[in-house]
């Protein structure tokens, strides 16, 4: 049942999400009726605290007044025209209204035409109303040059005694912009009135066609009229002509209607036939009044009317009196010019008659020429006198299109600052005007920097104006959104009596209209400007989304620094964010100024309906303006059919009567008023009984939960009578196994309807242990109780503004229920954990190192340490072998768990309480014989506890890892070369490497072959071979090589091979040449080819460094050369002599005789035996 009750309670509530403008109950001005709203603002009379909604309107038949004041009457907005506001004649092109505690200033830009001016003028008329909206002063700027005083005082830069005047906290502006201008259709009568207001100039030419004029002179008169009309048509687009010829008869050659066709009118002039006879000048002038300047012949009531009389003599036989015609009522307002041709006008009577025809003064209206050929010399002078040439096509414009009052600020009870955006060819400027003296001083950039006049042209300076309250001074600023096509903000600076605008901030994107809207903000409401918001509503990303730049003002020198950039919802293009901005006062009720920014085209063209436009609310903080909006109000959520929602806005005053600041937002044709919602800030408290849990406690805990409003207002009290506070309790937050819980789940989710004693609400709750023992594992850490809360209100309740919790205060509070601890009557037990660790070695060689030992000594020299834990982080290539633990305290460790690239082993030391004691632990790891990817790794020991004031001890050891390998070079060997067996020898030098390389260590084999000895090239390397494809070899010529410095060698051939395998044979084939080297061989007996293994010792460890060097020695063998012929001859001669001597001695001894006889006997015996054998064979 309680669950159903809770769900029903929640379902009947509407969550209050928007902070903190109430969009559920807006008020709108009547749609389709008077007035048609262009802009709106709120104004309050300080003397009576009466607040009105002021709206501006275009000039129509239904809304004749440009300003209306509106009030809330029985939940409806009723509007009435503000009386005694002068309405200037002409077509209204814009209305600007600003207010301060000094009053209200309304300026109307009016399109008018001066008499005989060739072009229209767009200037302003301003009316200053008092705080009670009674008229105080009026200023008309049609003749601005006569109102200027270049020596008028400018107060900027001086200390200003009253900072309230013109301050950003009580000045709100609203003005109609061209981009959103869409006036109601006007009645036909009004259109006719406006046409007459721009009716132009009507010129009636009266030509003397009497008989006293010769035909050639009459033709010259017609040519003069043609040239005059053609000359005027080129400059004056609104000039119309009529031509009347007089003599014996008076006839209209063509009237004002016919002159619309320029070429036809010029042709008619040339086709005129002279009528002759008498000179009826007075009758001809009366004819123009009766038959030309009438509406039936194309004349407009408010057009400027001019007569040009061309005659060759005095009046003759005219029935009408000239004086009577001149003084007739129809002649009033008609300017007359007279041209007398001929000698007759030298007489006094005829001259007086000519002056009577012309208007005063005669110097500029009566002309005399001696003959008709001299008429063309009068054209330029006549044109200048008839039509004022200032402001004509091609000429520079000064104040004709100034639009005085396009933007405005009230400075005090007599001075105003008015933007003149169109002055000086739209370079713009500002007018500092004194409403009492009716004098002003024009301020612009051109006067200050004539060299930069080209950049100033068309910059629209004065599009927006504002006043900054700097430290003990005022500063006038003006926006120029087209300055150098990027836009800029100008600040008025003084040098002596000179004052001019100079740029201080410039836009960053072409066409962004940077500076079109300025909004000074006094965040802390101390009277000094803290920030300046500068809008660039056409800033382009995908479309013209717009953005706002927030600049901070320096308190020291008043300089600007960019604080942040604001932008609207990224999903909308062409939103024009920043089109309007306003400081809204303290909407969030934190004594800080809030700001509203409009995006009137956001959602334009969307499919969800005809409403479009949004307003963003940004709250002020002590360190500045918030970076994100607290609320986005869309037109579609307010009312259907609202267009350009956010084109103007203002706030800061209470029109609804609830004591809170309200705001108004302008849309096309209507104004919307929103009330702000009371902001509630709650102070939450919680009391526990018992205040601390004893060890082994198994009872219930009484909880007293109270909510107290820290800031009570009438609106908040009224709203809280109907609001509900929904709160939720989360007991033992952050614990996987909770030790306490609510005795009844319903008591942890409450719908509270009544507040006790107005500002405080309390509730009693019960907490009880969960199933099992209350203190099974964690009996020492506090039990955290989190209270989350929110305000809710019944749906459809709009009688009072709905309260809302402060957006910037977390809607929850956390309270701690501690356990009792034996800590010498102190609130917290403070343990003092000390950790000391050592490792058996810092450098480990994979493949060589077998074990690593870490000794850990943990000491608690303080009070009890609860739930003491030790975390041991070590690299994965260390495998736990054994762990030596003391018998006391008890240490229990979990199995290591892989986390990322390490293993973590968690140990519980002396759980639950580690008393004052020490523990020594030894951890032994075995190093895996696998390649380790990193050069270093850390072993980290971290010890923590669960005391309220946690203790933390940790130590880290960094291990250096290298990988071992075995590489053996073949033993040194000797080779022999017989240098006497030819001039060159081909040799191959083999370097054999073998060993064990389990971890893919890369090492280098360097072979050094001496090639040049004493400047002679002895050895040339021909070829290099290797057996492994992975081996990469390079070679170069070096002057020194390897580890040995061998004498006589000047150059080496160095071969470097990178090897990563177990075995490799590298063979270097070379050619040894001895040509021209006989002298060298006298001193050089051998060559040494060197071989050496090297490697990166920071990565690898060579396990047999004694076998990393070898050499191959080449020994040279040398043969002696002898002259053999003399020795042979001498030996032969000596031998013969010795033989002869021996023979002589033997002969004398009879040696040869006995021997010879024996030989002969043996020969005879052999012959006989042979013969006997032959005979036997034959037989």
Swiss-Prot record:
Q: Where is the VWFA domain?
A: 200-389
Signal peptide per UniProt? 1-18
> Superkingdom of the source?
Eukaryota
GFFKR motif (motif): residue ranges: 1150-1154
> What spans are recorded as compositionally biased (Acidic residues)?
182-200
**Stretches for region Disordered:** 158-200
Listed binding positions for Ca(2+) 2 are: 586, 588, 590, 594
Q: Where does Ca(2+) 1 bind?
A: 522, 524, 526, 530
Q: Which pairs of Cys residues are joined through disulfide bonds in the record?
A: 70-79, 126-159, 706-762, 823-829, 893-907, 1008-1033, 1041-1057
Q: Which GO terms describe its molecular function?
A: integrin binding; metal ion binding
> InterPro entries attached here?
FG-GAP, Int_alpha_beta-p, Integrin_alpha, Integrin_alpha_C_CS, Integrin_alpha_Ig-like_2, Integrin_alpha_N, Integrin_dom_sf, VWF_A
Q: Which residues cross the membrane?
A: 1125-1147
Its subcellular locations are: Membrane
- So which stretches are on the Extracellular side? 19-1124
- Predominantly, its location class is membrane
Concerning Pfam families, the annotation shows: FG-GAP, Integrin_A_Ig_2, Integrin_alpha, VWA
Mode of membrane association: Single-pass type I membrane protein
Q: Which UniProt keywords apply?
A: Calcium, Cell adhesion, Cleavage on pair of basic residues, Disulfide bond, Glycoprotein, Integrin, Magnesium, Membrane, Metal-binding, Receptor, Repeat, Signal, Transmembrane, Transmembrane helix
Q: What is the effect of changing residue 316 to A?
A: Loss of E-cadherin binding
Region ranges (X-domain (extra domain)): 145-199
Glycosylation: which residues? 49, 271, 321, 444, 726, 782, 857, 934, 954, 1065, 1096
Where Ca(2+) 3 binds, per the record, is at: 654, 656, 658, 662
Assigned protein family: Belongs to the integrin alpha chain family.
What is the purpose of this protein?
Answer: Integrin alpha-E/beta-7 is a receptor for E-cadherin. It mediates adhesion of intra-epithelial T-lymphocytes to epithelial cell monolayers.
Q: What is this protein called?
A: Integrin alpha-E
Protein's organism = Homo sapiens (Human)
């Amino acid at each position: 049942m309680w669950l159903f009750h809770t769900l029903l309670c929640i379902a009947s509530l509407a969550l209050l999400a928007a902070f903190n403008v109430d969009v559920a109950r807006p008020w709108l001005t009547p749609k389709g009726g008077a007035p048609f709203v262009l802009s709106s603002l709120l104004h309050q009379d300080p003397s009576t605290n009466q607040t009105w909604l002021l709206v501006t309107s275009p000039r129509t038949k239904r809304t004749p007044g440009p300003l209306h004041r509106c009030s809330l009457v029985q939940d409806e907005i009723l509007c009435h025209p503000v009386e005694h506001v002068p309405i200037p004649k002409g077509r209204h092109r814009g209305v600007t209204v600003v207010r301060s505690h000094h009053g209200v200033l309304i300026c109307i830009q009016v399109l008018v035409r001066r008499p005989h001016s060739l072009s229209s003028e767009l200037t302003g008329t301003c009316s200053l109303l008092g705080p009670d909206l009674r008229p105080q002063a009026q200023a008309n700027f049609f003749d601005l040059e006569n109102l200027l005083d270049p020596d008028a005082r400018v107060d900027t830069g001086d200390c200003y005694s009253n900072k309230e005047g013109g301050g950003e906290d009580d000045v709100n502006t609203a003005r109609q912009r061209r981009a959103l201008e869409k006036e109601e259709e006007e009645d036909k009568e009004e259109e006719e009135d406006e046409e007459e207001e721009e009716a132009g100039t009507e010129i009636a030419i009266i030509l003397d066609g009497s008989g006293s004029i010769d035909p050639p002179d009459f033709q010259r008169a017609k040519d003069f009229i043609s040239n005059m009309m053609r000359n005027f048509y080129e400059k004056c687009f609104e000039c119309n002509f009529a031509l009347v010829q007089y003599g014996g008869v008076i006839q209209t050659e063509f009237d004002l209607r016919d002159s619309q066709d320029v070429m036809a009118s010029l042709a008619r002039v040339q086709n005129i036939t002279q009528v002759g006879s008498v000179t009826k000048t007075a009758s001809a002038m009366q004819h123009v009044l009766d038959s030309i300047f009438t509406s039936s012949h194309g004349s407009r009531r408010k057009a400027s009317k001019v007569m040009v009389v061309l005659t060759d003599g005095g009046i003759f036989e005219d029935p009408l009196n000239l004086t009577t015609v001149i003084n007739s009522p129809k002649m009033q307002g008609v300017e007359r010019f007279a041209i007398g041709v001929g000698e007759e006008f030298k007489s006094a009577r005829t001259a007086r008659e000519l002056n009577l025809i012309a208007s005063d003064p005669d110097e500029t209206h009566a002309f005399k020429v001696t003959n008709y050929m001299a008429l063309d010399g009068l054209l330029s002078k006549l044109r200048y006198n008839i039509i004022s040439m200032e402001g004509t096509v091609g000429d520079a414009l000064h104040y004709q299109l100034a639009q005085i009052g396009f933007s405005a600020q009230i400075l005090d009870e007599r001075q105003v600052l008015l933007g003149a955006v169109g002055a000086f060819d739209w370079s713009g400027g500002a007018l500092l005007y004194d409403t009492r003296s009716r004098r002003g001083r024009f301020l612009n950039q051109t006067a200050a920097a004539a060299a930069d006049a080209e950049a100033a042209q068309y910059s629209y300076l004065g599009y927006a104006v504002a006043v900054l309250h700097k430290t003990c001074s005022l500063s006038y600023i003006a926006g120029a959104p087209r300055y150098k096509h990027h836009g800029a903000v100008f600040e008025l600076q003084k040098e002596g009596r000179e004052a001019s605008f100079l740029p201080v901030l410039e836009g960053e994107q072409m066409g962004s209209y940077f500076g079109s809207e300025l909004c000074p903000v006094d965040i802390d409401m101390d009277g000094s400007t803290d920030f300046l918001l500068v809008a660039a509503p056409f800033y382009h990303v995908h479309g013209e989304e717009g953005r706002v730049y927030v600049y901070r003002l320096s308190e020291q020198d008043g300089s600007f620094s960019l604080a942040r950039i604001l932008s609207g919802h990224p999903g909308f293009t062409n939103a024009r964010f920043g089109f309007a901005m306003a400081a809204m006062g303290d909407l969030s009720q934190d004594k800080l100024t809030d700001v509203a920014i409009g995006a009137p085209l956001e959602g334009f063209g969307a499919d969800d309906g005809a409403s479009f436009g949004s307003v963003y609310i940004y709250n002020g903080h002590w360190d500045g303006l918030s970076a994100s909006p607290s609320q986005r109000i869309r037109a579609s959520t307010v009312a259907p059919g609202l267009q350009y929602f956010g084109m103007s806005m203002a706030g800061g005053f209470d029109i609804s009567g609830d004591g809170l600041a309200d705001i108004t937002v302008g849309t096309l044709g209507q104004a919307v008023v929103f009330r702000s919602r009371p902001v509630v800030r709650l102070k939450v408290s919680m009391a526990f009984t018992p205040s601390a849990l004893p060890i082994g406690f198994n009872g219930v805990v009484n909880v007293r939960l109270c909510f107290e409003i820290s800031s009570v207002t009438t609106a908040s009290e009224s709203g809280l009578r109907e609001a509900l506070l929904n709160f939720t309790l989360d007991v033992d937050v952050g614990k996987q196994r909770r030790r306490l819980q609510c005795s009844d789940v319903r008591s942890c989710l409450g719908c509270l309807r009544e507040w006790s004693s107005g500002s405080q609400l309390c509730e009693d709750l019960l907490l009880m242990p969960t199933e099992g023992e209350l203190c099974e594992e964690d009996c020492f850490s506090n039990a955290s109780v989190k209270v989350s809360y929110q305000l809710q209100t019944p749906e459809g309740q709009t009688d009072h503004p709905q309260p809302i919790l402060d957006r910037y205060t977390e809607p929850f509070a956390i309270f701690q229920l501690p356990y009792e601890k034996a800590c010498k009557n102190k609130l917290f037990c403070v343990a003092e954990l000390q950790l000391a660790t050592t490792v058996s070695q810092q450098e480990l060689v994979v493949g060589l190192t077998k074990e690593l030992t870490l000794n850990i000594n943990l000491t608690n020299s303080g009070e009890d340490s609860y739930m003491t834990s030790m975390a041991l982080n070590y690299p994965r290539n260390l495998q736990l072998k054994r762990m030596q633990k003391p018998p006391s305290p008890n240490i229990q460790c979990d199995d290591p768990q892989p986390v990322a690239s390490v293993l973590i082993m968690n140990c519980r030391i002396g759980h639950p309480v580690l008393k004052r004691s020490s523990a020594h632990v030894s951890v032994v790891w075995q190093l895996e014989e696998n390649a380790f990817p990193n050069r270093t790794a850390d072993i980290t020991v971290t010890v923590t506890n669960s005391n309220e004031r946690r203790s933390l001890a940790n130590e880290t050891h960094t291990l250096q890892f290298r990988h071992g390998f075995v590489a053996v070079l073949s033993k040194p060997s000797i080779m022999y070369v017989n240098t006497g067996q030819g001039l060159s020898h081909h040799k191959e030098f083999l370097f054999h490497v073998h060993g064990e390389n389990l971890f893919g260590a890369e090492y280098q084999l360097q072979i050094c072959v001496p090639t040049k000895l004493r400047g002679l090239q002895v050895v040339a390397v021909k070829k290099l071979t290797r057996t492994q494809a992975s081996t990469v070899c390079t070679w170069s010529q070096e002057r020194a090589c390897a580890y040995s410095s061998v004498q006589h060698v000047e150059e080496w051939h160095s071969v470097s091979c990178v090897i990563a395998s177990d075995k490799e044979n590298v063979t270097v084939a070379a050619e040894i040449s001895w040509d021209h080297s006989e002298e060298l061989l006298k001193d050089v007996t051998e060559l040494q080819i060197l071989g050496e293994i090297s490697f990166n010792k920071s990565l690898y460890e060579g396990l047999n460094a004694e076998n990393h060097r070898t050499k191959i020695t080449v020994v040279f063998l040398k043969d002696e050369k002898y002259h053999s012929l003399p020795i042979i001859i001498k030996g032969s001669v000596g031998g013969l002599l010795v033989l002869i001597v021996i023979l002589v001695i033997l002969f004398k001894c009879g040696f040869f005789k006995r021997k010879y006889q024996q030989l002969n006997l043996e020969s005879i015996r052999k012959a006989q035996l042979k013969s006997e054998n032959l005979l036997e064979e034959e037989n």
